[in-house]
Amino acid sequence: VDLKNERNKQKALDLGSLSKEWGLVYFFKDNCRFCHLQSPLIKKLSTDYGFEVIAVSLDGSVNEHFPESLPDNGIGALLTKGQGIQQVPALFMVNREQTKSFLVSSGVVALEDILSRIALLGTKEPGASLFGGESLKDTAYPSASNPLNQE
């Protein structure tokens, strides 16, 4: 139990530092029942971990968890390279310099999974090896060996 508590404290510290570099953009609609399930979890990212959350309504509605929500004024198209938001709820993370953005989740996703994705996306480039070294997409993966034991 102590090890788990220590790991949770470290995760909170890591996410707290990521919240200084990254913000979140949350897309929703009022008539979306999944959005009503996901919204309180997204709010926890703000209250518990310090992430700035910009809530964007695709239908102009106001969300009870995000009364300061904004209408979509093109940010959805910007984050999706012109495709627009196809499914809600959708959560993106955007770095403070606005040079990078990543889709964190689409649909209802557990808070623990969202936190893991934020931690991973905030510290690794997509396609980068989780074990250090070269990108997995550029390296033949030796199936007979354990990647954790490679030198």
Predicted regions and their residues:
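C-type cytochrome heme c attachment motif
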Residues: 30-37, 90-92
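Short active-site neighborhood of thiol/selenol oxidoreductases, capturing the structured segment around
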Residues: 16-32
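N-terminal leader/targeting and pre-domain segments
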Residues: 1-19, 116, 122-128, 132-134
